[in-house]
Amino acid sequence: VWAEHSMWVQDPQYALALKGGVTIFHVLPGSANLIGGRGVTVKNLQRNTIQSMKYPDAKHSLKMACGENPKRVYGNRGQAPSTRMGNFAGYRKAWIEAENYLNKIEVYDSKSDEEKMVESPPKRDLKLDTLRDVLKDEILVHIHCYRAEEMALMIDVAKEFNYKITAFHHGVEAYKIADLLADNGICGALWADWWGFKHEAYDMVQANIAIVDQARGGKGCAIVHSDDERGI
């Protein structure tokens, strides 16, 4: 799914956010799925179409999620994943499929015009189109993740399949691996003052953002994302 396909240009929250000084949004799909879909960057302008709000040349993003959300949503339906082990098996399976898809496309593209006349291109797959573009460094990866050990494991998966994680969202335990995040050029989009609402969100410290930002002598990257009760 693509977030831009469900945005409402007349949403009153745009005007409310503008009063608070927010001029640009990055809008992402939700966090119920291992691999949720594409996000988009838009200007906070009064326009009649999403296309006219898009920020010029901004890359799409891919929203992923780890931890309790996907295993709860699918486990409650009697489907996989229902454990954290299942989550990681699902990521790796998807990236293997994406590598194979990319390889088939590259092989086809390398053929001569004469060969292409008699051979059909690989069948298009919208999900794998997005993952392929991540592998080509054309889409930025954003991951909903709370616990330190899971963020570290997600970094392992990214290295296994040679893509980069741009940011972890929420990251209440990011302070525990601040140096690891800095070493890998990964930002934290973190809450300033919200935690404890579920098991994986308990172990927070109020210095979380500062610790992540100042890691490795100031080479870290942390931004504050809203914890406003109105959902902005």
Briefly describe each language-model feature range:
Residues 13, 18-167:
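Polyanionic/metal-chelating signatures
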Residues 5, 120, 143-146, 169-170, ...:
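Glycine- and other small-residue-rich loops at beta-strand/loop junctions that grip anionic moieties
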Residues 1-15:
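Aromatic/His-enriched, Gly/Pro-containing loop or helix-boundary segments
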